[in-house]
Design a protein with these regions (language model features):
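Short alpha-helical transmembrane segments in multi-pass integral membrane proteins
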Residues: 37-104, 138, 146-177
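Small-residue-rich hydrophobic transmembrane alpha-helices
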Residues: 9-69, 106-125
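Short, non-helical or kinked segments that cap or interrupt transmembrane helices
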Residues: 120-127, 151, 155-156
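Membrane-embedded alpha-helical bundles that form the substrate/pore pathway
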Residues: 16-27, 94-110, 114, 129-136, ...
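Recurrent gating helices in multi-pass secondary carriers
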Residues: 3, 68-72, 133
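Interfacial/gating helices of multi-pass transporter permease domains
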Residues: 1-20, 87-91, 151-154
């Protein structure tokens, strides 16, 4: 938001609660699912544990779809309720519509990390998150400063960064299954 000035930074601050909800849905499903997975696995019920992982994955997919549609089509109303108006509403809407289209990346990016930890991959969970953060930072600079894509570029960098986290997590989880 800084390259756009005060309006860009204000937009990120007003829109962040929406992004936080997307990430918290993934984290909630991932944390709850990974705890149940560990309980079942510790009890010796490997089959049930794997079924629970599959169920949590489907739940993340379902919530991703619902959140994508809901946030995309109600973004202006949500932003208005959060206090956006005028230029902030316009910029926020531009930002959140991109974020909404990448909801699946946000939900899975945060939702798979707890499973990685419970598969014994705490280091890989950290690596996945660092890869996502680094990608976001590099692409923020590229999209916003170099290419001048503004809020659209900032949002695109965010969802691509989450996509990188998700990709590393998916590869790790697929190998461990």
């Amino acid at each position: 938001g800084n390259s756009i000035g005060d309006a860009g930074l204000s937009t990120i601050n007003i829109a962040y609660p929406i992004t936080a909800v997307l990430q918290s849905v993934g984290t909630g499903i991932g944390m709850g699912g990974s705890v149940k997975y560990s309980i079942l696995k510790a009890a010796g019920n490997e089959k049930k544990a794997r079924e629970f992982v599959a169920g949590a994955t489907w739940l993340m997919l379902l919530f991703s779809a619902v959140l994508t549609v809901t946030v995309f089509f109600t973004s202006e109303k949500i932003l208005s309720a959060l206090g956006a108006s005028g230029e902030l509403l316009t910029l926020g809407n531009e930002y959140i519509k991109v974020i909404a289209l990448g909801a699946i990346l946000q939900v899975f990016g945060t939702g798979l990390v707890p499973f990685m930890r419970n598969y014994g991959g705490s280091l890989w969970a950290m690596i996945a998150m660092i890869c996502g953060f680094a990608t976001n930072i590099a692409l923020d600079y590229t999209f916003v400063w170099v290419l001048g894509r503004g809020m659209y570029g900032a949002a695109l960098a965010t969802i691509i960064g989450q996509g990188v986290t998700m990709a590393v997590a998916l590869v790790y989880c697929a190998i461990k299954k």
